[in-house]
Amino acid sequence: SISTFGAAPSMVGYLYQVRLALLWAIRRSRTSDFVVSLETLDDVSFEVGGEPQAVLQAKHSLKTTANLTDLSAELWKTLRVWLVGLASGEIPLGTARFLITTAAAAPGSACGALGIEGRERDVAEAAKRLKHAATSSINGELKPAFEAYLALEETEREALLAHVYVIPSQPDAAEITEQLQSELYHVSLNHQALSVQMLEGWWFKRVLNELVHPEGGIPRAEIDAQISDIQESLKPDALPIDEDLDALMIAL
């Protein structure tokens, strides 16, 4: 079937990555300055003064029952990226590393032990489970990741995993819209959906331009300025007449 050549999962994954970058940028803009980049050090990276503060791996699954286990390719491919970045010095040890996925973390798994917070977070247990997975698996595709992990001393593994956070069961690429609307509630109480459409319209073009013509990332100030412009344009005394609004909605 010609459908075997389809790239829908990959395309959805890229769109998820772009939307997730915007969502995290809005959230981080409340507490710190940054420059956000896509497809440089990681899927998404936040830097301050040229130093990476946080890197994100975004994993989107079209399967509603996807689970992250100790042998999941998504987990080990992510760890390999971070291990290579650590070895090269491009991603320092102290950088926060986030694996954000629509899949669930299997109970009792290493991913379950690497959650954001709470009693379930247990770095030593995660390190032990990952060592067992790496030494017992016969998956040839993941062998380079296993070898890179096992090349570290036990203390080095735990030091790395202390900066690794797995955030499972996240909204999918379409459902992120609701989270964006919640984050932009202050922009316009009566036009939340429109404010998201306007911001994303700018964001997708801005990301594309940055990927084609790299300029060192997208600074927080630029995102804040765009949100402020949208907020001003959606004030009652600045709203366009109905015909103009309809035309804008069609264009978006």
Across the structure, where does each feature detected by a protein language model lie?
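Acidic metal-coordinating catalytic centers involved in nucleic-acid phosphodiester chemistry
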Residues: 1-8, 59-252
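Catalytic centers of nucleases
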Residues: 10-11, 15-84
